[in-house]
A protein has these predicted regions:
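N-terminal secretory/targeting leader peptides
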Residues: 32-138, 148, 157-354
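Short, low-complexity disordered leader/linker segments with a strong preference
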Residues: 1-51, 354
Length: 354
């Protein structure tokens, strides 16, 4: 067990000692596969209640956490109460990397999170870091439900995970103290980015000066002038009120912000066929629900920002095309790192739905 897993285990142990989490006996952590006899035995189970566990790093009021809770509710309802999914948000049982590894090991049944923290474990997930990929959210969602999704599932499976679905928080947008309405306006812009090589390369390709910084440090960075701008999905802009320190919200739509629902293969293998079917069905329905929730919240969040006095800028098609052309090299970098198959599939799927 490595250091990160140990850190998670300590937090998890504390919850157990408080009686929050019962022993994960049912998850059968030690079993990576089940033989035919095991399957027959499990299929014969009747009346046995099952408790599973879901976690996310995000705050309780985010779409990510709401996605998780909706999924848990649907699983319980569809199983007539026989399967209960206990949910933990706000990093209660670990940060993104910790809960991801715990899910691989079967200590957590389900994890809800963006793909960015998964890239260090599953490099192929970087295909979703391709910049300026989608003209609108409808195309993005069709692609995330299509052949690309089917191929990504295989890479997750290799890491003892089941990719159940991908919802989203919409696009990542930009807030700035500098007015931006053309490509040249990005030149020299000190913008906070995630610690993600492809995100950093994207902003450099536009001429900006990207500065990786912890999310918790962004507000003070804007306030003190350490950075001029930042980029996030609207939800992550609203909650900490970054807009209070910014004159403009620029709808750059530069990256989709995907939210995955993943399951531990070990836990899924320990379920009966009927129980797994319930999980798959609930995940599909909750994915659609989460996307609809994102859409419903976007207008409200835009209104909050606008009412604060921050000006909203919608970039014209010419500027968006210029940004896309300028950042083509990032696509090449991703292809060099993960191979051409997924990038080619992404291009083909985008062309199909455009």
């Amino acid at each position: 067990m490595n250091r990160k897993t140990n850190l998670f285990a300590k937090k998890f142990k504390k919850l157990i000692s408080l009686g929050v989490i019962s022993v994960l006996a049912f998850s059968m952590v030690g079993c990576s596969s089940l033989d035919t006899a095991d399957r027959r035995e499990k299929s014969a189970r009747t009346g046995e209640n099952v408790t599973l566990y879901a976690a996310c790093d995000s705050g309780a009021d985010t779409v990510t956490a709401k996605f998780m809770r909706d999924f848990a509710k649907r699983v319980e309802e569809k199983s007539n109460g026989k399967i209960k999914v206990e949910t933990y948000s706000d990093s209660q049982v670990g940060g993104d990397s910790e809960i991801f590894e715990a899910c691989q090991g079967g200590n957590i049944s389900f994890v809800f999170q963006a793909t960015s923290p998964q890239v260090s474990f599953i490099p192929e997930a970087a295909v979703l870091d391709a910049p300026m990929a989608f003209d609108n959210i409808e195309i993005a969602r069709k692609v995330l439900d299509g052949e690309l999704f089917e191929k990504l599932k295989g890479y997750y499976s290799e890491k003892d995970l089941v990719l159940l679905g991908i919802a989203d928080q919409g696009f990542r947008e930009t807030t700035s103290n500098k007015k931006i309405d053309k490509l040249s306006d990005f030149k020299g812009l000190k913008i906070r980015t995630m610690e993600n090589p492809y995100h950093i390369k994207f902003w450099k390709s536009l001429g900006a000066n990207p500065t990786p910084m912890s999310y918790s440090e962004v507000y003070i960075g804007l306030q003190q002038g350490t950075i001029d701008a930042q980029e996030n999905p609207l939800e992550a802009i609203i909650v900490p009120r970054f807009y209070e320190q910014q004159d403009y919200l620029v709808n750059t739509n530069h990256f989709i912000h995907p939210v995955t629902c993943i399951a531990s293969s070990k836990v899924m293998n320990s379920l009966t066929y009927e129980e797994r079917a319930i999980v798959y069905e609930a995940a599909e329905e909750s994915k659609v629900w989460a996307r609809n929730t994102t859409d419903k919240q976007l207008d409200d969040r835009i209104n909050v920002i606008e009412e604060s006095g921050t000006e909203i800028i919608n970039l014209d098609k010419k500027t968006l095309e210029a940004m896309k052309k300028a950042s083509e090299s990032v696509w090449d970098d991703i292809e060099n790192d993960i191979g051409s198959d997924l990038i080619d599939t992404l291009r083909d799927e985008i062309e199909k739905y455009n």
